[in-house]
């Protein structure tokens, strides 16, 4: 019997890097509302008392960058100097330019179907049947802990909570099946006037216990709640934040490979984002069809070229049919050209700010989480 531990982490919407991601995607959403053909690559940097929004944007839309940035920061919960960051009074700097015409000529085509990829690169998608959302369990529960932290904070259930937080979940596996939770780490920013006993008890009762499956917890499970003993200075006062620095948190928590490209602030012509979503969609439908228990897809593209330069499938010995057959089914049922996958997943819509915290995958509201091709795939593979 093989036994091993596997760990994934998540961060809250108030983590500095996630503040940056949410600002970048809020800018993208507002532009897409006005200009579906916009080209957007928006980057954000946050530090004590300031937010810098930059990048390359070509659009007919007009967006009040300063007001939108302040709104996002305040919505997260940073709206008073006592917390260390105040969306009402922080400086907002705008350093946005236009996308290079050299890139435009490779992407834009007379026929939309011939639209080229916005850059070269490799993208991965993954699915596993170990959770109901066909995502790895460790990252799924790490995200849910962070969502619960925000819910408890915003409802005032624990009024000493502050926006910045991190979680980490270590699962124990035997023969590739989860048998329990070995360790939980949860660090949360808090007010200066609360003692650590109160923090520990509050986090256990209001955040950890309502989220983690009771059958996975035991007297051997280890809990590390604010293990440094104090977490008052947080958010951009504690660390600077930058768009695109939480790419493993955004995807599969280390359970699958990553092509290296970040998502937030990029319009769907950037295959770093859109093709990673498409790869997840393909992998999830393969697992939902029962063609594999685990499935990882790799796609690759060349800048200015519509067709993917490669498609790879890995099922880790769990496939019910050959990987080569799965590649053929992918080519038959999924249009993975940039314009094709944008249409297939209806990506030209202002949905991206909500992706920028708690993971881009495993959340039913997003179109790449549909399993509407599973029955077709199953039938085509001749599985009864």
From Swiss-Prot:
ATP binds at residues 15, 164-166, 230-231, 239, 245-246, 262, 266. It comes from the Bacteria. SUPFAM superfamilies: S-adenosylmethionine synthetase (SSF55973). K(+) binds at residue 43. It is found in: Cytoplasm. Binds 2 divalent ions per subunit. Pfam families: S-AdoMet_synt_C, S-AdoMet_synt_M, S-AdoMet_synt_N. The keyword Nucleotide-binding applies. Mg(2+) binds at residue 17. Pathway: Amino-acid biosynthesis; S-adenosyl-L-methionine biosynthesis; S-adenosyl-L-methionine from L-methionine: step 1/1. Homotetramer; dimer of dimers. Belongs to the AdoMet synthase family. This is S-adenosylmethionine synthase. It comes from Histophilus somni (strain 2336).
């Amino acid at each position: 019997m093989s036994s091993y531990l596997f760990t994934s982490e998540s961060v809250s919407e108030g983590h500095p890097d996630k503040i940056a991601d949410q600002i970048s995607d809020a800018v993208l959403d507002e532009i897409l509302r006005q200009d579906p053909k916009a080209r957007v690559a928006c980057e954000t940097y946050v530090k004590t008392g300031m937010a810098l929004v930059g990048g390359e944007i070509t659009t007919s839309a007009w967006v009040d960058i300063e007001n939108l940035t302040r709104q996002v920061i305040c919505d997260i919960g940073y709206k008073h100097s006592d917390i260390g960051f105040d969306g009402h009074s922080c400086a907002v700097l705008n350093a946005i330019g236009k996308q290079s015409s050299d890139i435009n000529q490779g992407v834009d085509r007379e026929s939309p179907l011939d639209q080229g990829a916005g850059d070269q690169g490799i993208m991965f998608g993954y699915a596993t049947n170990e959770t109901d959302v066909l995502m790895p369990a460790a990252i799924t529960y790490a995200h849910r802990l962070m969502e619960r932290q925000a819910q408890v904070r915003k409802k005032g259930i624990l009024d000493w909570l502050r926006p910045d937080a991190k979680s980490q979940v270590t699962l124990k596996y035997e023969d590739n099946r989860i048998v329990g939770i070995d360790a939980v780490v949860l660090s949360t920013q808090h007010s200066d006037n609360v003692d650590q006993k109160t923090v520990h008890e509050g986090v256990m009762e209001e955040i950890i216990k309502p989220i983690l499956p009771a059958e996975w917890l035991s007297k051997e499970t280890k809990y590390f709640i604010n293990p440094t003993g104090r977490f008052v200075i947080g958010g951009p006062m504690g660390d600077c934040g930058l768009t695109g620095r939480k790419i493993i948190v955004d995807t599969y928590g280390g359970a699958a490979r990553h092509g290296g490209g970040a998502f937030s602030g990029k319009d769907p012509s950037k295959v770093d984002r859109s093709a990673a979503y498409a790869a997840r969609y393909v992998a999830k439908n393969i697992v939902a069809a029962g063609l594999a228990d685990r499935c990882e897809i790799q796609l690759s593209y060349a800048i200015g070229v519509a067709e993917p330069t490669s498609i790879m499938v890995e099922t880790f010995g769990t496939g019910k049919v050959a990987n080569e057959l799965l590649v053929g089914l992918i080519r038959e049922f999924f249009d993975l050209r940039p314009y094709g996958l944008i249409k297939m997943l209806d990506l030209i819509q202002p949905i991206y700010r909500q992706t920028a915290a708690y993971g881009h995958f495993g959340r039913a509201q997003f179109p790449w989480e549909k399993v509407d091709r599973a029955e077709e795939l199953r039938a085509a593979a001749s599985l009864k």
